[in-house]
Every structure is written in C-alpha cells, then in structure tokens.
From Swiss-Prot:
InterPro entries found in the cross-reference section: Ribosom_uL1_bac-type (IPR005878), Ribosomal_uL1 (IPR002143), Ribosomal_uL1-like (IPR023674), Ribosomal_uL1/biogenesis (IPR028364), Ribosomal_uL1_3-a/b-sand (IPR016095), Ribosomal_uL1_CS (IPR023673)
Gene3D superfamilies: 3.30.190.20, 3.40.50.790
Keywords from the named record: Repressor, Ribonucleoprotein, Ribosomal protein, RNA-binding, rRNA-binding, Translation regulation, tRNA-binding
Gene Ontology BP annotations: regulation of translation; translation
Protein name, per record: Large ribosomal subunit protein uL1
Disulfide bond found in the keyword field: no
Gene encoding the protein: rplA
PANTHER family: 54S RIBOSOMAL PROTEIN L1, MITOCHONDRIAL, LARGE RIBOSOMAL SUBUNIT PROTEIN UL1M
GO terms assigned for molecular function: rRNA binding; structural constituent of ribosome; tRNA binding
SUBUNIT field: Part of the 50S ribosomal subunit.
Amino acid sequence: MAKKSKQLRAALEKIDSTKAYSVEEAVALAKETNFAKFDATVEVAYNLNIDVKKADQQIRGAMVLPNGTGKTSRVLVFARGAKAEEAKAAGADFVGEDDLVAKINDGWLDFDVVIATPDMMALVGRLGRVLGPRNLMPNPKTGTVTMDVAKAVEESKGGKITYRADRAGNVQAIIGKVSFEAEKLVENFKAFNETIQKAKPATAKGTYVTNLTITTTQGVGIKVDVNSL
C-alpha cells in the first residue's frame, strides 16, 4: 500500500491539476503516469449539460472504435434456428434460449455483451432485474436487439462500445489500453468525441461539454481542454 501511495504521489506531481490539457497531452500523461502492473484500461469521462429527465435529452448509443478496445468481449446471443447458427458462425461465445435464461438466473454471468433477436425479447425480459443494473439488457439503440446477429457479434468482438448518460449527465467509455500507441488512443478518442458531439440534443442550452477527463485504471484523472476539441 505504501508503494502504491508513493507511485500515486509521483503521478500527481507530473500532472498540473489547475491545467486543462490537449487530447494529445492528456493521452501522453495517462500513459506516462500509469503505475498499474497490468495493461490498464484508458477511459474518457464527460460531464454534459443535459437534462436526462427530458426524453429528447437522453443520450445513449453504441459505436465501433477504429482501433478497438484492446479487450476481447465474451458475447452471448439469444436466438433460435437459422439466427442461432448465424451467431455461432460469427463467433458468439454462447448461443441459446431458455437454457441460458435458467443459467443466468442461477447466478452465471461470465459474459460481457448480450444480443437478442426481436422475437426473443419476451424471454430475455425475464432477466431484467439481473441484466438491467449491469447495463447488459439488449436494446435497439445500442444495436443489440437485431435480426442481423452476425454483424452485431462481429462488431462486439471488434471494438464496439456502448455509452449512456447517467442522471447527472456523466458519460464514460473505454478508448483502449495503455499498451496502445498514443496515436491510436487519440484516434479512438476523436472518434468517440465526434459521436458525443453529434448526439447533442437540439434542445440542450449553454455549454454542452462542461468537463472532460482521461484516466487509466487506478490512475489519476487528467483534465482535457474542451475548447481544443
């Protein structure tokens, strides 16, 4: 614990808490100040000036990062017949129907993404209390309720991320690993930022992005200059 505290202090000394950095500077600092002994995840956190209580100001969606996330997602698909075979051929880790519902209800959660064909949603709905709080419930807005299960599986395996604004307007997302080249992290960030900017509600007033930070697992938040975007 003492060693970790020392590493944290060393990281803090390299970051000016009063300064907002360019994206390139923030990414470089995130890599430089990372002290985790594993390949830490690099994340971005936005605070948006929106009112999620209003239906037209709810922000939620999905996108595929140009350089992936550095993580291989375990994909579960609820489908039957030909669609189940398509999911298996596309590389889904688990494919099934009632058998998977029973397994999940028994406490099994060894998966990262859940996809379902529309006709399976009545069945999947039984898992709302389990999947909902974990942001795993399939949703058309994130492309996880679809007849094109092959595409959904391939995207989930190839760097697809989902995002959603919470009640306070905070949006968090993975943009890669510290082992990524800085340029690839910057490219991923810019792609995600473009998505967030395009999602700005027409009724949102004032400054849209009020705060933006980049951080690593166990790392220090580095403020990004929103005016430089």
